[in-house]
Amino acid sequence: MSEPKGRGAAWTEERGTSDKGPPPQAARQARRRLESGPAASGKGSAPEASELLALPGAVEASWPDEGVAAHYGDPMREQRAAEQSAAIVDRSNRGVLRITGQDRLSWLHSLTTQHLEGLAAGQAAQALILSPTGHVEHHLTLADDGTAVWVHVEPGTAAALAEFLESMRFMLRVEVADVSQDYSVLTVLGPAGDDLAAGLDAVAARVSPGPFGSIDLIVARDLLPEVAGDLLRRGAAAAGMWAFEALRIAARVPRLGLDTDHRTIPHEVGWIETAVHLNKGCYRGQETVARVHNLGHPPRRLVFLHLDGSADRLPAHGDPVELAGDDPGDEHRAAVGFTGSAARHYELGPIGLALVKRTVPVDATLLAGGVAAAQEVVVPPDAGGGVQVTLRRRQFL
């Protein structure tokens, strides 16, 4: 996980403000300061800075989570609150799509890897959009509210997804709207999260459970400070993306664009279990999914890394993974994979996820960006080939 930009804003009781929700004036000032920085120069497409960066101690995150908080002063305490009680995580940098029309579920069913026909109102699902050759292009977290399907996706990917969906509408009764500028994602974590999030009137949609037990609230962007403040007053702690990422990694949950690359197929990272329905009809990329599941094995597999705690750094995203037994003086050592995500966990210490070749021995010690790492199997080497496997994942909640 990359270092934050070190830019934050706080407000105090001296200004007549509460410590349980960001005052609109301070939030607007924080936003103006953020927008006047390098991201406002027109280079790149950095997301709009969240108003919750006005919370006390907020430090803005860097790629891939610009625009929201990395932490609020104590990432370890934030993780503990998220696992033991309740915490809210500002994920308003994510893209949000709203899909309406009578054919919305059957249409999405035909385009994605998931069985979405008859999806009950309020029921959450994960789905993938694959390339014609079966490589993962989009990971969708979604729910239908009875009148529309709400989808949230990785930062910066909503426009491309909306463009693809528009190209596949044909004569069907569906409408696709990229509402990322108008709606945001606020995630609630922890065993007390359900009770705290109950009865929130200002929530447009609720996507629950999320990929690792989270409650993802879709909130109108101008109401985000109000909803966050309400949850803080109810007893939730504010947690940043450092805490969220550490808990995600500990739960062995991959993230598109970090733990995947352009060649990733669903089997390699375990999405065959959570985002793919193996008995549904035809969709783009299905031939690859069926062939690997029934006849072969994925060429790579996701592993969980216990990183050397004596190292003073974490491996960076994309750092090569090598076998620790190879000659350290050999400049031409072959990489056996790449590092995806890495973070410091409040109990487990430095941890990470990596994608390695299937043939790497499961008991081999690895080097991730030069940092020694013991591996735990997430996706077994015998995945596919008609073998029914259970992913080795840590229960989060």
Regions found by a protein language model. Give the residues of each.
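Glycine-rich, small/acidic residue-mixed loop/short-helix segments
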Residues: S2-E3, G8-T12, D19-P23, I272-V276, ...
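Glycine-centered loop/turn motifs
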Residues: A121-A124, V203, R252, G257, ...
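Short, intrinsically disordered, mixed-charge
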Residues: H109-E117, E163-M171, G229, R233, ...
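Short glycine-/aliphatic-rich beta-strand segments at the starts of folded cytosolic domains
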Residues: I88-S110, E175-P191, H297-D308
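Acidic, proline/glycine-enriched N-terminal capping motif
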Residues: M1-Q126, L130, H135-E137
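Short amphipathic beta-strand starts and helix->beta connectors
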Residues: P75-Q84, A125-H139, R169-L172, A197-A205, ...
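Anionic-ligand-binding alpha/beta catalytic cores of soluble enzymes and soluble regulatory domains
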Residues: I218-H306
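Acidic, low-complexity central loop/insert segments
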Residues: V96, H138-P254
